[in-house]
């Protein structure tokens, strides 16, 4: 039988963790003064005033590296819980994780062959 009251703590946590950021933004929007001026519209980074055009377009190489990083970062997130519960899950979970890693390795080889990892 599906017991809904067992999920009360989950729903309370979800509502509270969703309400805290919303309340923080609302309170900061109400309490902070709004002053518009040229300083607010200029780019400012690391204490250095920009010289010339501050808007630069990033090369596509940065995005490719970021994409490959995200893929393998997500892989690590999925493999860690699997490794911690390997003895409980058994051989079928090992085969599934092996296929998952194999697919990601094939993707890495594909990116490598296409030159996505070359920095030139």
Swiss-Prot record:
- Would you indicate the residue range of the signal peptide? none
GO cellular component, as recorded: chloroplast thylakoid membrane; NADH dehydrogenase complex
Q: Which reaction is catalysed here?
A: a plastoquinone + NADH + (n+1) H(+)(in) = a plastoquinol + NAD(+) + n H(+)(out); a plastoquinone + NADPH + (n+1) H(+)(in) = a plastoquinol + NADP(+) + n H(+)(out)
Q: Name one GO molecular function term.
A: NADH dehydrogenase (ubiquinone) activity
- E.C. number: 7.1.1.-
What are the record keywords, sorted?
Chloroplast, Membrane, NAD, NADP, Plastid, Plastoquinone, Quinone, Thylakoid, Translocase, Transmembrane, Transmembrane helix, Transport
* Transmembrane portions of the chain: 9-29, 64-84, 88-108
Where does it primarily localize?
A: plastid
- Mention one GO biological process in which this protein takes part, according to its record: photosynthesis, light reaction
InterPro entries in the cross-refs: NAD(P)H_OxRDtase_bac/plastid, NADH_UbQ/plastoQ_OxRdtase_su3, NDAH_ubi_oxred_su3_sf
Q: How does it sit in the membrane?
A: Multi-pass membrane protein
* Pfam name, any one: Oxidored_q4
Locations listed in the record = Plastid, Chloroplast thylakoid membrane
Its biological purpose is as follows:
NDH shuttles electrons from NAD(P)H:plastoquinone, via FMN and iron-sulfur (Fe-S) centers, to quinones in the photosynthetic chain and possibly in a chloroplast respiratory chain. The immediate electron acceptor for the enzyme in this species is believed to be plastoquinone. Couples the redox reaction to proton translocation, and thus conserves the redox energy in a proton gradient.
Family named by the database record: Belongs to the complex I subunit 3 family.
* Subunit record text: NDH is composed of at least 16 different subunits, 5 of which are encoded in the nucleus.
What's the protein called, per UniProt? NAD(P)H-quinone oxidoreductase subunit 3, chloroplastic
The species is: Crucihimalaya wallichii
Question: What gene is this protein translated from?
Answer: ndhC
């Amino acid at each position: 039988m599906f017991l809904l009251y067992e999920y009360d703590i989950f729903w309370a946590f979800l509502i509270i963790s969703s309400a805290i950021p919303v309340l923080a933004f609302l309170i900061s929007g109400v309490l902070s003064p709004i002053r518009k001026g040229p300083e607010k519209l200029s780019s400012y980074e690391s204490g250095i005033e920009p010289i010339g055009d501050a808007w630069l377009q990033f090369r596509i190489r940065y995005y490719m590296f970021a994409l490959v990083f995200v893929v393998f970062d997500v892989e690590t997130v999925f493999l860690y819980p699997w490794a911690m519960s390997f003895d409980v899950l058994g051989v079928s979970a090992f085969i599934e994780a092996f296929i998952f890693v194999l697919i990601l390795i094939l993707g890495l080889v594909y990116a490598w062959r296409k030159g996505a990892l070359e920095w030139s």
